[in-house]
Amino acid sequence: MRRFVLALFIGATVSTSAQKVGLVLSGGGAKGITHIGLIKALEENNIPIDYITGTSMGAIVGSLYSMGMSVEEMANLLKSEDFSQWSSGEIPPELRYNYHNATPKPTIVELPFSLNGKRIDSLQIKARFLPTNLVPPHQMNYAFVPLYAQATAAAGGDFDKLFVPFRCVASDVYKKEAVIFRKCQLGDAVRASMTFPFVYKPLTIDGRLLFDGGIFNNFPVDVMQNDFKPGFIIGSVVSENPDKPTESDPFSQVMVMIMNKTNYSIAKNEGFLFNFKLDDVDMFDFTPVDKLIKMGYDSAMVHQDTHLPHF
């Protein structure tokens, strides 16, 4: 009798574990808004999301959901004027008095230098200022504090204690390795994960200068497998490995130089992959929110009966 009860208990435990679902969200800039539509479809089909891992825009969407935001709340945030301002670095006119404004000059580009040493021919000339980012970081840094502070405090900085256990990935370019965030300020982790080189200013955490997680791991399915070991993995990919660069496209040249190739795949016996082809979507254009959400939703609904788990 005891063996029978024990067998039932073990069977129930295995069954419960096997039903756990992990959601992996790739980076891809504004294309990652598509992830929200996929989440909406999963919710409507009563498919639970037990764990989330994400990179860059996948980290933003994943973190918002992991701290309890609904699909509607995420969509409204991305369509808000506040989001537009902190993603572009634009400072509202009524707040500009809080910031130092440089004296207007007729120059297009100015690179001030300082001399370190008495002799110029010693080549001890160091740049005092060179721009490290195109988008000013102030708006984003200020916005992330109230956005993520409550969730961080409630979880005690432990991502396992969020509404949905969560991981995100950034890149340490000095050590040339991915950095997995499990415990820290949630806003800092997300901010580091989405810091695309030259667009956003890098963040220093624990002495490490961190950039966009997509440099070394743009689709953290391995993090999902190693940290959570779910019974079924749903992947959402809105990016692809860079094409061969061309002479006339400096952006493609930079992408090839900084981005490692990512394995965008999930084994058939481990889950299902949604691979969205969004070639006509600008990764820095965050305006077509409803369109991208609908694309993610429609694609998921097509595959719900044949490829997704049933509960």
PLM regions with names:
Residues 1-3, 238-239:
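Histidine- and/or cysteine-centered catalytic micro-motif in compact active-site loops
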Residues 3-16:
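Sec-dependent N-terminal signal peptides
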